[in-house]
Amino acid sequence: MADNSYTDIMEKNHMEIPWHDYARQDGNILIDKAGLIEKASVIGRVGLIMLSCGTGAWRVRTSMNRLSKVLGVTCTVDVGLMSIEFNCFDGTDCISQSLSIANTGVNTSKLYRMEQFVDNFPKEEAHLTGEEIHRRLDEIEHIHAIYSPARLGLAAAIACCAFTFLLGGGPIEMILAFVAAGIGNLIRTKLIKHHFTLFLNIAVSISASCFIYAAFLKIAEMAFNVPSIHEAGYICSMLFIIPGFPFITSGIDLAKLDLRSGLERLAYAIIIVMVATMFAWIMALLLRLQPMDFEDLNLTPVLHLILRLIMSFFGVFGFSIMFNSPAPMAATAALIGSIANSLRLELVDLTGMPAPPAAFAGALTAGLLASFIKQNNGYPRISLTVPSIVIMVPGLYLYRAIYNFGIMALSDAVSWFASAIMIIIALPLGLIFARILTDKTFRYCT
């Protein structure tokens, strides 16, 4: 590699790895006959790309193990949120590597392509050279957002609009949340595209959503005499920030005793929630907004169920698009979510079941449906399950907990926080037990 290229790499805080330098340039030796260093570069890079997609430690390790088995290598892997440490043994030599990614996120489209790569590796890539494999991985690694910031803003608008109805909001709150969430996520995706830091993009996008909701509500008050009671929907306008993937994958990792990955993902999710709710609370104080209860919609049970099915579908579809899922994958997740979330809500309303066990039942249903569908279309299970239950994450409860902490209403704050924690625990539990029931490789500790 030229000196100027190395200079460009070294100017970054997270230096890029010149993967092609580890492959033989003569093109005569296939990867299964190559040296341990070259094999380790392929195994490590596959794990690193999987990690960058937002998937959990179990899936990352499984993918690396499958490649190792084909290449005749023994591999031990320790996975975190942002880094992988692994050792490769071939009976003679040992290679230890520590790899890290510059930023974390969710990209289900890239994850799907990587799972296809791993599935096809014994039949295709195992018969290529290391250089040829790295070229294919270059193509996959360059799969970025398949949607423009405007479309991602629209997806957030649809998701939060549907979310508003599912939380009890009416048409006015839904319209205002649609506008505010759309603009807020548009700003967020623009900031992410320009690589601004996590805290900044959360603070700016959440503040923008709250301000836009309040501004449009004020315009509606002056132009159409809309009562100020509809200010309650401002919470829904910022729910696009909910860290559904790290919340759920942390639970799955903890279930498999991948404590490092599980705790790091949980910490990452908590950071996002704390920063988002703190800035939302500050904006609420500045704009004089209060998280009041929604007005009763007075819908018949049958109509309410039909609307819940429809809104759950669009809510999950929007979130799935935000996770960079192709439209067919997003529609599949939305179908699962519409059934699972409507079941959860109906269990609470019709049977009086507490919210946490109802959330467990909804997540279990989503997991079972996703496992059944995966057998037919091959979509990554996590790309279907997480979007389908992210609308069950109690973002409203978490915000109200922080809001009440801020105004020193400690009794209310603890009540909201306890309710949120119980639901947050129940959601990954539902997916975990669905996985235990349907996946024999997940059922055992090793």
Where are the model-predicted features located?
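Soluble N-terminal domains of membrane-associated systems
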Residues: 1-135, 139-141
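Core alpha-helical transmembrane segments of integral membrane proteins
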Residues: 146-249, 321-323, 327, 332
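Alpha-helical membrane-inserting segments
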Residues: 162-167, 183-192, 208, 212-220, ...
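Structural signature of hydrophobic alpha-helical transmembrane segments
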Residues: 165-180, 229-243, 295-311, 351-365, ...
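Membrane-interface helix termini and inter-helical loops of multi-pass transporters
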Residues: 220-229, 287-301, 404-415
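C-terminal transmembrane helix-loop-helix hairpin of multi-pass membrane proteins
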Residues: 233-238, 249-253, 257-272, 335, ...
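Generic multipass alpha-helical transmembrane bundles of integral membrane proteins
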Residues: 240-245, 268-350
